[in-house]
Amino acid sequence: MTMLETLDLGRRLSRPEYDRDLLRYQVQLRELAWQLYRRKRSLVAVFEGRDAAGKGGNIRRLTEKLDPRGYEVFPIAAPEGEDQTHHYLWRFWRRLLPPDEKQIMIFDRSWYGRVLVERVEGFCTEDAWKRAYREINDFERQLVDAGAMVVKFWLQISPEEQLKRFEKRQDTAYKRWKLTPEDWRNREKWGRYDEAVEDMLLRTSTLTAPWTVVESNFKWFGRVKCLKTVVEAVSKALDYKPADPVIETQARKPGGKAGKPGKKTGGKPHA
């Protein structure tokens, strides 16, 4: 059984749990973003996943309470123009180095296109995508050596859930633009993409830049898991524990009791 097959895609949160945890981690991330600025550190967050897996929704919740001067989101599509004349990592280096005033840089799709869509669709040679695992690991190692933290998310949904989301997009006028013929064609290659994803997770999850696999059939659960993972990764890297706004609010209430928030460490790709 593969890693993706072992995921429990039924994991979910109730509305009160979602509202509570979303507030908690958004406020904590805002505090941590200020610490990144003070310490001249940066965070690189990568979101990959199936079409309609929720990358954009996760990124919106991640940035919702951040100072817009301190982050930038890079939506990545197929290379065009000058980008096509260089090594595939060139266009990403241009965005990341030299560091500017942005503490948080977020990629909606990324350099992993080389070992995902380019591999499956035959846009590069087999030698090229096999070589890319080492190139990507070296690339991310250089980012870490330059003072960045790297967090990477694979958002996993089932074929059935993806179909539901496609049909909803098709039936909703203001969402219809998101659905393309290519999205439907990609569904026919689900197994080949699964194989590429498994190889990617196995070969590019490192101690310094681990993958987090996010069960995303239920959007509320996936959003909170991503936010929590980012907060814990930055908190650990900075050795700084942000205040918990939920506990502080409870403590201010008559008879309220303040508890201690749990803490989770990073590691290899996990669910």
Give the predicted meaning of each segment.
Residues 1-271:
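Glycine-rich phosphate-binding loop of ATP-dependent small-molecule kinases
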